A protein has these predicted regions:
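Two-metal-ion RNase H-like nuclease active-site motif
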Residues: 1-10, 201-204
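Short conserved beta-strand segments at catalytic cores or DNA/RNA-binding microdomains
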Residues: 6-20
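Conserved acidic
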Residues: 16-530
């Protein structure tokens, strides 16, 4: 059992959850003090490191190296820094030299920095970091893990669980099949279909959507791959290049637009375009009569035997999540979803060691199709879709056992205000993330100024190393006010015949959308080099 020590640093010095402080040099030696069986955490890493660099007199040139190369040699010391994730100090260049590393608990519970200036407030921040770290540590050990840092839940889970499972990777997939599969990965689906205000709306989501699909994945080494321009119905997985034609106004088939103008966004247009789709996506198009697909070429995986490699571990995580609450539940959920992320992980030096575009594609597209099936089957005109959830203006009955993994559940019934894509809020459902839209805040702003065309949220944010090096070096470590603006009637992902002009219009009208025609937003598909 390890103990947790919290740290907070400002321009006056270093403060710890043990009630200690260091207000003069040598600051690095203070941080290096040996603490056996201890995990050290920052209340807000980027803020603390910015101020530590000021305390130890780092020059701009040295800071540039730390930011861009992630390490810096200072006399006998070596600093390593990945912003918001990891920081370490080593003293000396020999085996078992003094060494310490830190994690950032701000990723688990958003830190408030506005009033953390006095000694008492700094010590309280350090204690808060310790308490958050203890909850994270308790959650991970409850999963049977033995973390030595709190940098990433999925990292320790990967080391102690995933690495012990013999999983197929990109090396087990024909190169072109892997390329086809990767092209079907378009990212999470977030889209708003209606704008306005509803006195009653219903928030549905899939219970552990990504884990439920992870549990279904089978070992692709127990079968054979076949390239064919013909449809192969017995294939379990298929990745097809072809011409899709979408004729219906609601469809889960996305088109990614890169660059300016329409921005880098996923759209769900109507029309005809060349693309890559999974076998399941094509079957979905025909099941719901959304259009058609003209097959040019495909890669197909035909099973000889089916073995579900992740089912047991995913089920364990799910049961643990259902028995948890608060931060612990969020950490377990994040860990389970992080498994999918490993299958699509791309690093600076190439693919991650578990990179598997087949698994990544199957999970991602399956969730989109589950959401679309729910919408179409229940004849919902959705207000919005956010990855694995649907906000609906109508109630859906007969959901079955909502507590089972992969089943639909009603998570909230409340008033809802929708401004545009990713700008939707349910009353009473406040989120901790920075600049998350609050129903209460927006309603108050509209009532205060009903004729406004935009509303701005403000918060204090640290001048981090990256920000300071971008023309604000003298302000390193200070707090600055940043703003996020909610614009009324400025939604480009779908087209509206009429849009709200002022805030008050949102409260008095409903605005329905239609998909763009592909000819308005299209750009060419890039072919691989062979």
């Amino acid at each position: 059992m390890k103990k947790i020590i919290g740290y907070h640093i400002n321009k006056s010095g270093i403060y710890t959850s043990k009630g200690e402080s260091c207000l003069e040099s040598p600051f690095l030696d203070f941080l290096l003090q040996p603490e056996p069986d201890t995990i050290k955490v920052f209340y807000h890493m980027e803020y603390s490191i910015s101020n530590l660099l000021i305390l130890i007199g780092v020059t701009r040139e040295e800071a540039e190296k730390l930011q861009h190369k992630n390490y810096l040699h200072l006399d006998a010391y070596t600093l390593k820094y990945i912003p918001g994730k990891y920081f370490s100090i080593a003293k000396g260049h020999y085996y078992k030299c003094p060494f310490v590393n830190f994690s950032d608990v701000n990723q688990y519970s958003s830190a408030k920095l506005e009033n953390v200036t006095s000694k008492e407030a700094c010590l309280a921040a350090a204690l808060n970091a310790q308490e958050t770290g203890e909850e994270v540590y308790k959650t991970l050990t409850g999963l049977g893990l033995n973390p030595t840092s709190l940098t990433s839940p999925i990292k320790v889970y990967e080391k102690e669980v995933l690495d012990k499972i013999d999983l197929p990777t990109i090396d087990d997939i024909p190169e072109d099949a892997g390329f086809y599969a990767y092209q079907t990965c378009q990212g999470n689906w977030v889209e708003t279909f209606q704008i306005g205000h509803w006195e009653t709306a219903y928030d549905y989501d899939i219970n552990s959507a990504y884990p439920s699909e992870l549990a279904k994945l089978v070992d692709i080494r127990l079968g054979k791959w076949k390239e064919s321009k013909q449809w192969i119905p017995e294939a379990k997985y298929g990745y097809c290049k072809g011409i899709v034609t979408i004729t219906e106004p609601y469809s889960p088939i996305t088109y990614n637009v890169k660059g300016s103008g329409f921005n880098n966004l996923n759209y769900t247009p109507v029309g005809e375009w060349e693309t890559f789709l999974t076998k399941e996506q094509i079957e979905f198009i025909y099941k719901w009569k959304l259009g058609k697909f003209e097959l040019i070429n495909g890669w197909w995986w035909i099973p000889e035997k089916e073995s579900k490699l992740l089912e047991d571990e995913v089920t364990k995580l799910y049961l643990q999540k259902e028995q948890s609450k608060g931060l612990s539940k969020k950490i377990i959920k994040r860990t389970a979803s992080g498994i999918w992320g490993k299958f699509l992980q791309v690093q600076k030096d190439g693919f991650g060691d578990k990179f598997n575009p087949v698994y990544g594609a199957e999970v991602e597209t399956a969730v989109k199709l589950r959401v679309s099936d729910f919408v179409l089957r229940n004849r919902i005109n959705p207000i919005s879709i956010a990855v694995d959830g649907v906000i609906s203006p109508k109630v859906v009955n007969d959901l079955g056992n909502e507590n089972e993994i992969g089943r639909w559940k009603l998570t909230d019934t409340a008033s809802c205000i929708s401004v545009g894509t990713a700008t939707v809020a349910m009353k009473g459902k406040e989120k901790n993330a920075d600049f998350s839209l609050s129903y209460k805040w927006l309603m108050e702003e509209i009532k205060r100024d009903p004729k406004a065309t935009e509303y701005s949220m403000k918060k204090m944010s640290p001048v981090t190393l990256a920000v300071a090096l971008n023309g604000n070096w003298e302000k390193l470590g200070e707090l600055r006010e940043i703003t996020k603006t909610v614009y009324i009637g400025n939604n480009v992902k779908r087209q509206y015949k009429k849009t709200p002009e002022y805030g008050e219009d949102l409260l008095n009208n409903y605005y329905k959308s239609e998909p763009w025609d592909i000819t308005v937003i299209s750009n060419p598909v890039e072919e691989p080099d062979h």
